[in-house]
Amino acid sequence: MTAHRIPLSDLEQGIPFEQRHIGPDSEARAKMLAQVGYGSLDELTATAVPDVIKNAEALELPGARTEAEVLAELRSLADRNQVLGSMIGLGYYGTFTPPVILRNVMENPAWYTAYTPYQPEISQGRLEALLNFQTVVAELTGLPTSGASLLDEGTAAAEAMALSRRMGKNKKGLFLVDADALPQTIAVIETRAEPTGVEVVVADLSEGIPAGIAEREINGVLIQYPGASGAVRDIKPLVEQAHELGAVVTVAADLLALTLLTSPGELGADIAVGTTQRFGVPMGFGGPHAGYMAVREKFARSLPGRLVGVSVDADGHKAYRLALQTREQHIRREKATSNICTAQVLLAVMAGMYAVYHGPDGLRTIARRTHRYATILAEGLKAGGVEVVHGAYFDTLTARVPGRAAEIVAAAREGGVNLHLVDADLVSISCDETTTRAQLGAVWTAFGVEGDIEALDAAAEDTLPAALLRTDDYLTHPVFHQYRSETAMLRYLRRLSDRDYALDRGMIPLGSCTMKLNATTEMEPVTWPEFGQLHPFAPAEQAQGYLTLIRELEERLAEVTGYDKVSLQPNAGSQGELAGLLAVRGYHRANGDEQRTVCLIPSSAHGTNAASAVMAGMKVVVVKTADDGEIDVEDLRAKIEQYRDELSVLMITYPSTHGVFEEHVADICAQVHEAGGQVYVDGANLNALVGLAKPGHFGGDVSHLNLHKTFCIPHGGGGPGVGPVGVRAHLAPYLPNHPLQPEAGPATGVGPISAAPWGSAGILPISWSYVRLMGGEGLKRATQVAVLSANYIAKRLEPHYPVLYTGPGGLVAHECIIDLRPLTKATGVSVDDIAKRLIDYGFHAPTMSFPVAGTLMIEPTESEDLGELDRFCEAMIAIRAEVEKVGSGEWPAEDNPLRNAPHTAAALGGEWEHAYSREEAVFPAGVSAADKYWPPVRRIDQAFGDRNLVCSCPPLDAYDD
């Protein structure tokens, strides 16, 4: 018998999840607190966080649950979702995710825990995968340049509208939209157009541009191909007519259909947009999925989002990188026409690998089978006396059944199949990769007809017009032909992931990015079919599990932030910003204050802030930042007075982008409110606030959150993300809504921000699980440890590198900025040199030169244990000693391990003529040969890649370098 008998209830609990999520245990935290000079976490945060913003009470959240309990709760929610056969279509289709891709990409932390490939030398695997994706999109659309993903089809179409505005000839003209476009796409375009003054006209374009519209100035035209109704028509005459009128032409195209149909590029399109969801990505109740955009060459340098290109490294070997980054919002700020940054990399990788796995022949077979099912279904309906509206279609047909549509849709539902109710007389039916013979039979039964599949198969003919059949070859690169066996595919995926650095390998201390644990328990339910295979427009009664989860997550996020209402629709932080600013705009306009259009933004703000403000129809006015990193209060006061009658909103990040808790934040908010403005608190740094302070209580009217930062959704190598927007009650009537799901938002809302009603709903179980696993106290402790870890690093590095900004008590928030400018001035060693040298030490670099050029911003998060924090600190201290050797002349300025970093395994072979040893190059202080990370390439020549733009798969020999 033991001296102390543990109660059964304690034994049943096991180790709390909090101890799995938070890296430093109690003993380690005591050591860290001693280093920082505090006796407890409460004492530390009592000093760091200004009194005026502190929570008066604990978070009112359900208590923490064990991992087993949370999985059981999620299983109960999942069981309340009914997964019927989906034949709704409208841009979302059933698809089979090849298990080798599901297990080795979607469920693999080597892929889903990576960050955006800003450090290309340690991102070669996913950059190659994204190049595959770009090649698939470019070749299927017949356009030379494709981006590395957008957020969804609706936002891609809206981005095409903005690109047309920027690049088109008739810049003040209207934007004409095909009435047969997807309804959610039309709605997103209208939401995005209104604030910027773009007139959108929706018209039937089946017979060309109507005369009354053709007489007007047209900036751009968007055509759906095939149409939402299923119609396949020759759009070339329409494209030619639009071009004659000086318009830019965008075609929203189905990639699977393009394996059989003439490409948009060949038909004359300038831009092609769409979604790659049906290339192996589960529907997920609306997302996440990778949208796409491909463009003609003259538009390439204005393409929104990320673009992967081919360059060379220091040895002249082929290497991949993000190209033309000066296009992006973090560079262009208020001059940007898009706020897209992180998009949908993980899903783009999956879609690209789907094409690699199936190859062009496999994709054609899937497309032909899908089309055959549609033709058999149509012939059976026609034989039973049902009118099929269009004679040419790919996968979708529309049936006319006067007065019977609702009855038929209900009968099909009873038979286990969801159809799309168009109106009282029309029913739309879509086939896909997962369609079965039994589903065809269920549809016929619902219509009251019978069909013999074998007989109809023998008689049915393809309906695609001969003139539109694709004749050119595509996906001819060897990568789309050499991985047919699962063994080969498995090894290809492993080779690529081994080239990358992700959280499964080590800490990623990127400031303002919050690269914390994405726990397996949180991730596991995402691929359950009850969550993954539900169509976003399925009837609400079939999605009760999802709707309950969504409501609970919204309520819990509202409690955490102090807001009254939260919308989960925005599928990225950038879209959350836009949604929040549109809510502010809607509020002012409802009050008759249309003149309130000025948005005040500190000079240190995230680049998306300014870009989003412009997209919301606002005028950006920059507020100075003081020498201590805080907002220049005097300049702010002056700007408030100058624009008092025009002031719409102040956008601030809290804690600030300089990594400190600003003491005057409540006073700043009060000044803006007194002048009639609203306060937008950017939630990028919420990981320093949860459980300690609530933006909605210290003056914020609206915030977006980043569930892919604070609430554990993985970054996926550059997406997916979720950017919910939280608002005070007076702004709630102006949150996003959706035309196809009334439950998704208020009737008075600004319209949809995303194509799907609840955005990337498929990954919301991750954040729901995190909050449930941690409980209110656990969330608070996670925040406190995040603050402790940042201060621990700051204290350890301060003797070697100046910490640029501190707040109350000389403390930082959850991140710290170290100033390398004095070192660079004295030695010539740049911030880039130190970032690349960290690779040799086995680390991803911190954030470079943001928000201050020549600095590193370090955010360790609460998930890294003391051993990893110390390993990073020791690497930085060792690098500081290396910089001294350069400064003293012991190592030449142009030939030292910093200037030549990173070093590859290939560098060890052959002659060695450097002023430092091989060991100093690849096994610097503290680096073990046993678990060394070897970068696959040396430093990449960024300028070469932009001068020689190549954005699709290079010749095969490049893969062997």
UniProtKB/Swiss-Prot annotation:
InterPro entries: GcvP, GDC-P_C, GDC-P_N, GDC_P, PyrdxlP-dep_Trfase, PyrdxlP-dep_Trfase_major, PyrdxlP-dep_Trfase_small. It catalyses: N(6)-[(R)-lipoyl]-L-lysyl-[glycine-cleavage complex H protein] + glycine + H(+) = N(6)-[(R)-S(8)-aminomethyldihydrolipoyl]-L-lysyl-[glycine-cleavage complex H protein] + CO2. Its EC number is 1.4.4.2. Keywords: Oxidoreductase, Pyridoxal phosphate. Its cofactor is pyridoxal 5'-phosphate. The glycine cleavage system is composed of four proteins: P, T, L and H. This is Glycine dehydrogenase (decarboxylating). It comes from Streptomyces avermitilis (strain ATCC 31267 / DSM 46492 / JCM 5070 / NBRC 14893 / NCIMB 12804 / NRRL 8165 / MA-4680). The gene is gcvP.
